[in-house]
């Protein structure tokens, strides 16, 4: 472990079970924080970057409704629905995992760096990208398959007709 980053190989016991069943799952996953995706219920939540008041209200109600089940909430730590759902999860004491489209040595968007410590208190971050990888456009679609692949269910809160959430 270097810089508090660990690596999980596809054949390791702690590699996410659901992700093992994805034909295009990554061979290696880098992680930071308290992450165990094999012993609890997991729900992925994704949506538009241009969140509306409806999306915010949905995130608040959804987390309030599922909190008694104590699931892990996975999202992309991006603008809009992603950060909204992750902040609600933290506020309600749920573990949350940010699945990133870049290396773990940075946070994108930078404005979300202030939430990184909140997530790391009871959750963490996942990525298939090396620490030096930047947030390239094509990485976001690659990341989406992991967001969906680690969970039992994926909830799309809001999305444009051709939004990236719909390929998750």
Protein language model annotation of sequence segments:
Residues 3, 7-168:
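Glycine-biased, small-residue-rich flexible motifs in mid-sequence functional cores and linkers
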